[in-house]
Amino acid sequence: MHDIWVITTSPACFEILYKYCKQKGRARMGGLIVKIIRFNHASV
């Protein structure tokens, strides 16, 4: 799961998502983040 954090193109925004995910402690956030990353890469 940690390899997901490496492929983001916006570290600042991603750090916020990571902290939020840690606070909530929900596995669903991981899936949501993956979708966001894929969307970002598709946009680029």
From Swiss-Prot:
GO cellular component, one term: peroxisome
Name the UniProt record assigns to this protein: Uncharacterized protein YHL048C-A
UniProt source species: Saccharomyces cerevisiae (strain ATCC 204508 / S288c) (Baker's yeast)
